[in-house]
């Protein structure tokens, strides 16, 4: 099985909160798709709460679109990581890490402005697969933590695992 790009970087050296360009690719028509690793917590040290990350999933995608979409950028999807340390964001375009970080900060400020649980988009059994698993309070605590810490940039060349280590860690 081919090694996924996200597993070629050293998770023990990742800063968080931080933005990282996880992958770029060209479509057959020439558009650039960029995938960003939006790392909220340090891997293997902390995880986002189940209800908090789920509520953020509902809020964050819309708020990020409000702050990042434009003539040269269109967000395709923002999805939580299975390890619950952040989100992956796929988009058309090539915004800088700083543009993404600025949008992320603005989105976290928006999360803090949500006044009540009933203001969470699509929080109902028709549009959400686990409508009971939400906590605005936990999502707002995550947002506050991001705002308090600030958002830095993780660079792939600084995090790359050596080829010898990738071979050593490989399971056939």
UniProtKB/Swiss-Prot annotation:
Alphabetized Gene3D superfamilies for the sequence: S-ribosylhomocysteinase (LuxS)
Binding site for Fe cation: 54, 58, 128
GO terms of biological process kind: quorum sensing
Cofactor note: Binds 1 Fe cation per subunit.
Alphabetized UniProt keyword annotations: Autoinducer synthesis, Iron, Lyase, Metal-binding, Quorum sensing
Domain of life: Bacteria
MF terms in GO: iron ion binding; S-ribosylhomocysteine lyase activity
Keyword Metal-binding: yes
Reaction(s) catalysed (UniProt annotation): S-(5-deoxy-D-ribos-5-yl)-L-homocysteine = (S)-4,5-dihydroxypentane-2,3-dione + L-homocysteine
Keyword Mitochondrion among record annotations: no
HAMAP family, per database record: LuxS
Known function: Involved in the synthesis of autoinducer 2 (AI-2) which is secreted by bacteria and is used to communicate both the cell density and the metabolic potential of the environment. The regulation of gene expression in response to changes in cell density is called quorum sensing. Catalyzes the transformation of S-ribosylhomocysteine (RHC) to homocysteine (HC) and 4,5-dihydroxy-2,3-pentadione (DPD).
Family the entry assigns: Belongs to the LuxS family.
Stated name of the protein: S-ribosylhomocysteine lyase
Source organism: Vibrio alginolyticus
């Amino acid at each position: 099985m081919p090694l996924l790009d996200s597993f070629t970087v050293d998770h023990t050296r990742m800063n968080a909160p931080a933005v990282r360009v996880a992958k770029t690719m060209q479509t057959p028509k020439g558009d650039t798709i960029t995938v960003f690793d939006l790392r909220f917590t340090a891997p293997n040290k902390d995880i986002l709460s189940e209800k908090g990350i789920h509520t953020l999933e509902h809020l964050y995608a819309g708020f990020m679109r409000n702050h990042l979409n434009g003539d040269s950028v269109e967000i395709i999807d923002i999805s939580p990581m299975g390890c619950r340390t952040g989100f992956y964001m796929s988009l058309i375009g090539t915004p800088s890490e700083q543009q993404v970080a600025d949008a992320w900060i603005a989105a976290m400020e928006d999360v803090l402005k949500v006044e009540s649980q009933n203001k969470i988009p699509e929080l109902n059994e028709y549009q959400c697969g686990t409508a009971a698993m939400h906590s605005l309070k936990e999502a707002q605590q995550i947002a506050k933590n991001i705002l308090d810490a600030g958002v830095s940039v993780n660079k792939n060349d600084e995090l790359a695992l050596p080829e010898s280590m990738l071979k050593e860690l490989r399971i056939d």
